[in-house]
Design a protein with these regions (language model features):
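Rossmann-like S-adenosyl-L-methionine
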Residues: 1-133
Length: 133
């Protein structure tokens, strides 16, 4: 999230791995970034309507879920929060397609960019930009 901080009024990050949150906080401090807040935990336990109310409705959400994709309760909260844009990064195009179908009524795909981060393997990262309808 730190790479976006200069273009945003506020960054709120949620990550399952507590050590990654510790690193993000250190990187924010080292780079003089003061508009970030980070929370450790599983998205389906952390992200709810109260979390959105406490942290503000997002303009943009960047999703990078595990291989299993985004849990339905998380998608429901995202749809209620209604950000203008969603950037969905996925290592599993099948679960990404499933999740995109669940958001299709509220969002349209504006851009898709596969990224070959693991040459000579079948693995690909897929980045999709969604905009609210």
């Amino acid at each position: 999230a730190n790479f976006c901080a200069a273009r945003c009024a506020k960054i709120v990050g949620v990550e399952y791995v507590p050590e990654a949150i510790d690193d993000a906080k250190v990187n924010s401090a080292l780079n003089g970034i003061g508009n970030t807040r980070f929370y450790a935990g599983d998205m389906k336990a952390v992200l709810d309507d109260a979390f959105v109310a406490a942290n503000g409705r997002p303009d943009v959400i960047i999703l990078d879920p595990p291989r299993a994709g985004v849990d339905q309760p998380v998608i429901d909260v995202i749809l209620r929060a209604a950000p203008e844009r969603i950037v969905y990064v996925s290592c599993n195009p099948a679960t990404q397609a499933r999740d995109l179908a669940l958001m299709d009524g509220a969002y349209r795909v504006e851009a898709v960019q596969p990224v070959d981060m693991f040459p000579h393997t079948h693995h690909v990262e897929n980045v999709v930009k969604l905009v609210r309808r």
